[in-house]
């Protein structure tokens, strides 16, 4: 009887320890991605995403709450409908309306996880300068904190082409938004750029490199971690190293037949 009791006690202790072991979470956000990955269709080669889909759960009836960055991300990161958050534009702050709302990353932080983030998770116009400071255990890594390829340097706005760099060089004191407005006004805002440069010459490559370094650092912590990684593509403009463009034959890209503005869509949803 004593042996049975001891065995049961040991099993209970082991079960308790296992129950307390939390998983580490890598949360990846992608901007403006249509369901054209290999898990849904063979339209374009997406081997990395296909591997993730094969190992996990693929949703076949998932819908975006709103096709605008601010409302969509506010909804995803709070678990609330846009009609509840009342974030319908690209300027209203989430906490200006809901000061005590609990975000996804904040919930994990409140429950013992170490939370960190890089890139575009919240729309920056919907949160404070710290990308909703209370959601993170450490300072959030904004795009301007990233390390870019040493040879190319960081992109000007989104670009590395000489025309865009020339316009931006005229006013070196201008911030990111001012530079982009100037590029747009001077027709130096191309929809596509395909230069023969390394991944980390552009934002998403630099974001990925930072995420890899963060994973290695966070793995050494005693706490479980939640790392949020927000990629900016395939949102316009379509800028990426040439090697990725070379994977696809332009002749195989089908233009969607419907080219009109959807009824009720805000103007800035189609300004690109």
Q: Where would I find each of the regions flagged by the language model?
A:
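Sec-dependent N-terminal signal peptides
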Residues: 4-14
């Amino acid at each position: 009887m004593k042996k049975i009791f001891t065995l049961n006690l040991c099993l209970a202790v082991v079960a308790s320890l296992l129950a307390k072991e939390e998983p580490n979470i890598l949360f990846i956000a992608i901007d403006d991605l249509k369901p054209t990955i290999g898990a849904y269709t063979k339209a374009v080669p997406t081997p990395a995403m296909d591997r993730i889909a094969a190992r996990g759960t693929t949703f076949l009836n998932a819908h975006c709450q709103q096709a605008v960055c601010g409302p969509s991300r506010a909804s995803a990161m709070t678990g609330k409908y846009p009609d509840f958050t009342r974030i319908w534009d690209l300027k209203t702050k989430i906490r200006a309306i809901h000061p005590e709302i609990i975000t996804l990353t904040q919930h994990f932080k409140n429950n013992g996880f170490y939370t960190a983030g890089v890139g575009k998770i919240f729309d920056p116009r919907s949160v404070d300068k710290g990308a909703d400071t209370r959601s993170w255990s450490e300072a959030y890594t904004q795009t301007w904190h990233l390390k870019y390829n040493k040879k190319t340097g960081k992109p000007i706005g989104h670009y590395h082409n000489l025309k865009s760099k020339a316009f931006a060089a005229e006013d070196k004191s201008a911030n990111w938004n001012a530079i982009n407005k100037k590029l747009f006004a001077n027709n130096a805002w191309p929809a596509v750029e395909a230069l023969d440069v390394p991944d980390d010459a552009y934002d998403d490559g630099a974001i990925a490199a930072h995420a890899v370094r963060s994973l290695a650092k966070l793995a050494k912590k005693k706490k479980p971690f939640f790392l949020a990684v927000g990629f900016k593509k395939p949102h316009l403009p379509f800028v990426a190293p040439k090697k990725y463009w070379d994977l696809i034959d332009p002749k195989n890209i089908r233009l969607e037949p419907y080219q009109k503005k959807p009824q009720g869509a805000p103007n800035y949803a189609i300004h690109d």
